[in-house]
Every structure is written in structure tokens, then in C-alpha cells.
Amino acid sequence: MEIHPLGPAQTDDAADLFGSNASTRGCWCMWFLLPVRDVQAGWGDTNRGRFEMLATETSPPGGLLAYQDGKAVGWCAMGPRTRYPRAAGSKLMAQRDPDEDADVWFVPCFFVRTGSRRAGITEQLLRAVVAYAGEHGATAVEGFPLAGDGPHKTDRYLGTEPLFAACGFTAIARPTPRRVIMRRELAY
């Protein structure tokens, strides 16, 4: 398995990966970046164009791609909380310290290609995000995955509490019965 940051050279690989699923084919990982009406109005090609701009004009990169045998099989969005205004401003994150938004990185979503799931790709991506964020000056990494370890039929793109815990994250808040804020402090 190889993991690479999103850049211009990876946009075709991301298109192939996202094209394998109706949700990712429409959203293009814009859900937490833009107002809902803009994401929905841009469903498909417009969101793809926005994603390609993210790949070419954003630093740090908008996420990481996991490759197996030269084919993109997984994705994890990442970046400073300032990049994700919908997430940072949500009721789930109401207790966050906004003064940390530039230094604390956020992991809003994952996607793994059908046929490659349940192989540990998401965990490898999350571990790579932690390392990458630390190398680029982040003081912590957060996510708001699904709480517990029950069978979740929806919202798995957020990750799960056991996934984050396995990667050294600690629960810092439980804003709803279904969601938990997980955080990993970085000492780099």
C-alpha cells in the first residue's frame, strides 16, 4: 500500500476512485467545505471542478489517496479546521476553541472503493494523516466519527470511534448519542 497527498498528478486517480460510487461521484468531498445549497447545486461536474481546484491550489493538500497495485482504493480528506467551515461551525463542534482552528487539523471523511473495504485501508489513511499533519505543524488532529462500535448503515464515511481510538485518538466530547469528537494531540 502506498499513500500520497492529493496534488495535480492525482486528480485522475481520484476521479476514478470517486466515480466508482454515486455519492462520491456527486459530492467530491465538498460537503464540509461549502454550504449545503452550494454542494447540492454543484452535484457532479461542478463539485468535481471544485475538487480539482483543491488538488491544484491548496496547501496543505486536501487529503490523502491510498493506492494498491497502482490503483487508488481509498481517500481521506484532511486539513486545518479553517478549511472546513461547515464542520467547525456545526453544533457538534460548538465546544471547540476557535483560536485553534488554524493549528488543529480535521478529518471529515473517508472513502474506500468497494472490493477493497475491510482491509485496514481507512486505518492506514488515518495514521498517515496524523503523521502528515505533524510534519506540517499541526498541534492536534480531530474528527467527529460515529460513536461506539455498533453496525452503522449510514454515515460510515465519517469513520468510527474504534477506528480513531486504534490510531491514538481520545474522546473529548459526545455531542449526540451517535457522534463523538475524537482528538489526538501531536508532540512533534
Predicted features along the sequence, with ranges:
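A short helix-loop-beta-strand connector motif used in the catalytic cores of GNAT acetyltransferases and
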Residues: V39, D45-L65, R81-A88, F106
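Conserved acetyl-CoA-binding loop-helix of GNAT-fold acetyltransferases
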Residues: V107-V112, R118-E135
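Conserved hydrophobic beta-strand within the GNAT/NAT acetyltransferase core sheet
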Residues: V107, V141-G143
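Conserved active-site alpha-helix within GNAT-family acetyltransferase domains
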Residues: G134-T139, A147-R174
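Conserved acyl-donor/pantetheine-binding loop and adjacent beta-alpha core of acyl/acetyltransferases
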Residues: Y67, K71-C109, R113, R117, ...
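Conserved N-terminal entry element of GNAT/NAT acetyltransferase domains
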Residues: M1-R37
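Short hydrophobic/aromatic beta-strand or adjacent loop that forms the aromatic wall/cage
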Residues: P61, P177-M182
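Short, solvent-exposed beta-strand-terminating loops
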Residues: L17-N21, C76-R86, A131-A133
